[in-house]
């Protein structure tokens, strides 16, 4: 479990990539990705990373993929990539522009349920896929309506609720000032 607050990745090979079962429960909050090398999207890359949150990511000429990569060849004795994530959430992400070859800022084809709630900006489309390996189709709500989504950030909402429930109102006030 890791929290990445405001990370930036530009001109990278898979600007962000999350791989494997040990890389589960991660939060990417207020990040920025742009211009991947050879159109290689940011992604959940291989071996079922579970229950991650991509929250308020700005996507510029890039795309974030949560897809079945069973067809991706393994190398050097590693198995094929397989289904890459399940129960991961994309929350209120903003698209500035689409990659030339892909008219969506998010592609989701997660094992079981995946969730995409709220997108915004001039590039707001989501591509959903579903196969026998990943059914049912992931949940999509608020495509293009993220500006009016409540709460604006799932991470911030859950952090506030947790701290207040634990009687840590002073801690929440200090944290909120830094957001």
Listing of model-derived features with the role each one plays in the protein:
Residues 15, 39-40, 62-67, 97-106:
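Acidic/polar loop patches that form or flank catalytic/metal-binding clefts of enzymes
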Residues 1-17, 22-38, 43, 48-61, ...:
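Right-handed parallel beta-helix
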Residues 91, 96-179:
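Long, contiguous C-terminal flanking segments immediately downstream of a protein's structured core
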Residues 63-77:
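Acidic/polar low-complexity surface segments
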